[in-house]
Amino acid sequence: MSSIVAPERVLFAGEAGDIETLIEYPVEAPRAIAVGCHPHPLFGGSLTNKVIHTVSRAFLAAGAIAIRFNFRGVGASGGTHDHGEGETRDLLTLVAQARARWPQLPLWLGGFSFGSWVSLRAQAALEPALLVSVAPPVGRWDFSTIAPPRCPWLVIQGDRDELVDVEAVSRWLQDNATPMGPPPQLLRLADADHFFHGRLHEVKDAVTGFVIASAA
């Protein structure tokens, strides 16, 4: 399943100014709203990042309205980088407006690296139907206050990640399993680096399969 119309570029209203957003639509009636969060803005992260683009295309292939957006200070989004605080509020604001636009649809949520941290910080308030975290930067940002997700949750981690401690991710997942929801599904890709060079097809296949199984 793929988009048959050009992506829609929308400027949503945020507390720091516009939130630049790219929206793609599935061929058939949508099953969900799916929001993807990009990696660190100060290191070139934006909605065009290839990893979050891959996650977004997987959401689209599974039948969702796929939404990517630029955090504050990136592209046409207003404001300046806020070390995750303002970015989390931007995500909450964007999802509220998307839900007002498509009130009947559940939310799927995903993020890569810094974006996975932001989406994890917001998920308790957003209550998504499912969650995808790619290379969550455990040890680089504060994960201590993140509530364990209560929805189906896929974590994809390369075991040759040069930026994230792979074992720290595994320990954090073990420590944050909750009886209130299904256990996280950890997929460790052998010989994959932080940006999954040459492995993005595996990321897309994993996300698509997880979403189809979880949203059935």
PLM features per residue range, with description:
Residues V51, H81-R101:
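Alpha/beta-hydrolase active-site loop
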Residues P149, W153-Q157, D161:
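Short beta-strand/loop motif that positions the catalytic acidic residue
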Residues D18, V27-R68:
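Short, surface-exposed "cap/lid" segments of acyl-processing enzymes
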Residues D159-V164, H194-F195:
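Acidic catalytic loop of the alpha/beta-hydrolase fold
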Residues H197-F210:
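Post-His helix in hydrolase/transferase enzymes
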Residues Q174-F195:
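Catalytic histidine neighborhood in serine/cysteine hydrolases
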Residues M1-A29:
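N-terminal cap/lid segment of alpha/beta-hydrolase-fold proteins
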Residues G110-S119:
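Gly/Ala-rich beta-loop-alpha elbow adjacent to hydrolase catalytic centers
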